[in-house]
């Protein structure tokens, strides 16, 4: 099949067989796994995954690709022709392993969507822009550390596994990519009931990165509150750990 990648779907198809083999080794698919592939494309990962699995669920929006996959992998592949951003992953049960070469144009909102189902997930392995992965795994007091780091690290432990060069794709993207492994925390750092407050407060904290917390969180905390939390209000948002943001969230919830 000659499929022209569609820009509106952010399609870049993986074609490097050495890289594909490395990714499959990292994922380590096993018979009995309840595995889901998001954006299978022309099956670069699909076939080697199926070689190790009893069945594979695939989520693909492009109708032409769905037709191709249906013809070539009908026996063990279950295809959902839907937008992954709107898909209810709880419909597939629990103990899920999710993989995929995620479309670059929806990767961040899709990660936030998937985080809602973290209690049903064993692990996730995704191909993403390298700069996105670096932001996901970033630590405090580094340039890449920000809201994305905190929101995802609250739910997942994450590790950058492999850098994938642009020439491994057709067409080559303008950026490097990387494989990230995400494993849900047994218990999120922020309780589920406080995540909305946590997200709003973190958004405010990073709204002006060069300003101090005294300014960015002035609608949430007084100097007395900072003293009680033992946090220097002269610090910037990037200087605080997830645990410190957790303490701030709980404190705000208590005093409201």
UniProtKB/Swiss-Prot annotation:
The keyword RNA-binding applies. It catalyses: adenosine(1518)/adenosine(1519) in 16S rRNA + 4 S-adenosyl-L-methionine = N(6)-dimethyladenosine(1518)/N(6)-dimethyladenosine(1519) in 16S rRNA + 4 S-adenosyl-L-homocysteine + 4 H(+). It is found in: Cytoplasm. Pfam families: RrnaAD. One of its GO terms (cellular component) is cytosol. One of its GO terms (molecular function) is 16S rRNA (adenine(1518)-N(6)/adenine(1519)-N(6))-dimethyltransferase activity. S-adenosyl-L-methionine binds at residues 12, 14, 39, 60, 83, 101. Coiled coil: none annotated. The keyword Amino-acid biosynthesis does not apply. Its EC number is 2.1.1.182. InterPro entries: KsgA/Erm, rRNA_Ade_diMease-like_C, rRNA_Ade_Mease_Trfase_CS, rRNA_Ade_methylase_Trfase_N, rRNA_adenine_dimethylase, SAM-dependent_MTases_sf. Keywords: Cytoplasm, Methyltransferase, RNA-binding, rRNA processing, S-adenosyl-L-methionine, Transferase. Signal peptide: none annotated. It is an enzyme of class 2 (transferase). NCBIfam families: ksgA (TIGR00755). Belongs to the class I-like SAM-binding methyltransferase superfamily. rRNA adenine N(6)-methyltransferase family. RsmA subfamily. Specifically dimethylates two adjacent adenosines (A1518 and A1519) in the loop of a conserved hairpin near the 3'-end of 16S rRNA in the 30S particle. May play a critical role in biogenesis of 30S subunits. This is Ribosomal RNA small subunit methyltransferase A. The gene is rsmA.
């Amino acid at each position: 099949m000659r499929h022209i990648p569609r820009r509106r779907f952010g399609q870049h198809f993986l074609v490097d067989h050495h890289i594909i083999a490395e990714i499959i080794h990292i994922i380590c698919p096993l018979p009995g796994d309840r595995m889901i592939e998001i954006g299978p494309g022309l099956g670069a990962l699909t076939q080697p995954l199926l070689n190790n699995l009893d069945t594979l669920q695939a989520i693909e929006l492009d109708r032409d690709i769905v037709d191709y996959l249906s013809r070539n992998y009908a026996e063990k592949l279950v295809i959902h022709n839907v937008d992954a951003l709107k898909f209810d992953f709880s419909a597939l049960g629990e103990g899920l392993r999710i993989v995929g070469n995620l479309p670059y144009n929806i990767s961040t909102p899709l990660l936030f969507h998937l985080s809602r189902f973290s209690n049903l997930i064993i692990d996730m392995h995704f191909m993403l822009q390298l700069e996105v992965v670096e932001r996901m795994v970033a630590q405090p007091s580094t340039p890449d550390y920000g809201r994305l780091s905190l929101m995802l690290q609250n739910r997942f432990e994450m590790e950058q596994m492999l850098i994938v060069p642009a020439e491994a794709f057709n067409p080559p993207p303008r950026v490097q990519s990387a494989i990230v492994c995400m494993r849900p925390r047994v218990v999120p750092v922020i309780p589920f009931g406080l995540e909305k407050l946590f997200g709003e407060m973190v958004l405010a904290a990073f709204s002006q990165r060069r300003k101090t917390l005294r300014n960015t969180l002035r609608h949430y905390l007084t100097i007395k509150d900072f003293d009680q939390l033992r946090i220097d209000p002269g610090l910037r948002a990037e200087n605080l750990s997830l645990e410190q943001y957790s303490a701030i969230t709980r404190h705000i919830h208590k005093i409201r």
